[in-house]
Regions:
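Charged, often flexible domain-edge or linker segments that flank or initiate folded functional domains
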Residues: 2-26, 31, 39, 44-157
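Conserved aromatic-histidine-acidic binding/catalytic patches
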Residues: 104-108, 180, 202-210, 232-236, ...
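Long, ordered, amphipathic alpha-helical scaffolds
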Residues: 311, 316-373
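Short intrinsically disordered terminal tails
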Residues: 1, 373-374
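Long recognition/docking surfaces used for binding and targeting
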Residues: 128-224
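A short mid-domain helix/strand-loop element embedded in enzyme catalytic domains
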Residues: 200-253, 273-276
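Conserved S-adenosyl-L-methionine
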Residues: 236-336
Length: 374
């Protein structure tokens, strides 16, 4: 579970304030009371001069004990019972939208709450839902934002083609002043955890992760009715998708390597149903090809997220464009996919070369220093 370092556990961090008294000269020794003497006039008593401090930190009084002001750790989120995953997905989307709108950021930046749900669904550690929930819900704001950056970086490293399509979900993490959004990000994160985002996407079995389309429910709930009408974007009921998959796909006659195409697929609800249909016939969706397109960049980004969450395999192409006007959006996406994978390989190879060069320099330094250097 080394990868759990993506979100370091929050601990109680004491803020120490040492109450040191102000530096001052010690008061002069008081004159003792006059003692009568048989002599006509008593001799004057000398005044004891005040001693200078030995140094800046000399202090004639004892130092007060340190004051410990503990900062209490955040309380973890306790998820609700999700019940039917499809109903739970709708509840999560609606709750996230309500939380986001109540955080004073409004709907004009719906990419941020969608990005949060997507990142939690993509969390690379599967099968440790309780641990992951505790770590995320108790980490600091800085760790939370950094954790989201690392999730998307890891996604790009493993699937650069799909990671590039998720660009609309990543931009806010690199903006100036992103820390100012931490309060709203925290609230949406807690809401998504409470409503079971990890319960629905944190299993090691892709079949269990394919019961619902969280990205569609989240985007639909956040988008205004007018915007949905303008885009022609509506959430297709999963029961209808299931029926259409059964009616249109003869799983018994399918050959491995066959491709499925969806020119206006939204976040991929039909592909989710089709993948489950294949699994019901003991077929692995990763043995087939999947090409999906949508006009809306945010929906296409959601489809890229779902392709990983649902385990559709390595042969996935997600494009964004007007399929009726352009016609070749899938072919173009296939070419872009090959270029992105090549670019990733070059970058990783360059980083490996730099690391190897650094290790070689260290080894040469040790050799030249001789056996006594250790």
């Amino acid at each position: 579970m080394d990868q759990l370092d993506l979100f370091a556990e929050a601990e109680e961090i004491p803020a120490t304030f040492t109450a040191r008294p102000a530096q001052s000269r010690p008061a002069a020794a008081p004159r003792p009371a006059a003692v009568p003497a048989p002599r006509p006039a008593p001799a004057p008593r000398p005044v004891v001069a005040a001693a200078e401090p030995d140094s800046l930190f000399a202090d004639p009084r004892p130092e007060l004990p340190a004051v410990q002001t503990p900062i209490p750790a955040r309380r973890g989120v306790t998820p609700l019972m999700i019940g039917n995953p499809r109903d739970a997905g709708q509840r999560l989307g609606e709750a996230v939208a309500e939380t986001w709108h109540a955080s004073n950021w409004g709907g004009y930046r719906m990419d941020i709450p969608v990005s949060i749900v997507a990142a939690l669904a993509l969390f690379p550690i599967k099968g440790h839902t309780e641990d992951v929930t505790r770590i995320i819900s108790t980490c600091t704001d800085w760790e939370l934002l950094q954790g989201y950056r690392e999730i998307y970086a890891a996604t790009w490293s493993s699937r650069p083609d799909l990671g590039a399509r998720m660009a609309p979900l990543m931009g806010w993490l690199t903006e100036d002043g992103v820390e100012e959004k931490a309060y709203a990000v925290r609230r949406v994160t807690d809401t998504a955890l409470k409503y079971g985002v990890l319960q629905m996407t944190g299993s090691t079995d892709p079949d269990s992760r394919s019961d619902t389309d969280l990205m569609s429910w989240t985007i639909t709930s956040l988008r205004s009715h007018g915007a949905r009408q303008g885009l022609g974007e509506y959430h297709t009921p999963p029961e209808l998708c299931d029926m259409m998959a059964r009616l249109t796909c003869d799983a018994e006659s399918l050959q491995k390597g066959a491709w499925f195409h969806e020119p206006a697929g939204g976040t991929g609800g039909m592909f989710r149903a089709l993948a489950q249909h294949l699994r019901n016939h003991h077929l692995d969706p990763a043995d087939f090809g999947w090409a999906i397109n949508d006009l809306d960049p945010l929906a296409a980004a959601g489809a890229a997220v779902n392709a990983i969450v649902w385990g559709l395999g390595p042969s996935v192409v997600v494009s964004c464009g007007d399929a009726l006007r352009q016609g070749d959006v899938v072919d173009q996406a296939i070419r872009e996919r090959a270029a992105l994978i090549e670019e990733r390989n070059q970058i990783v190879g360059y980083l490996a070369t730099v690391e190897a060069y650094g290790e070689a320099i260290k080894l040469a330094d040790r050799l030249m220093a001789g056996p006594t250097a250790a």
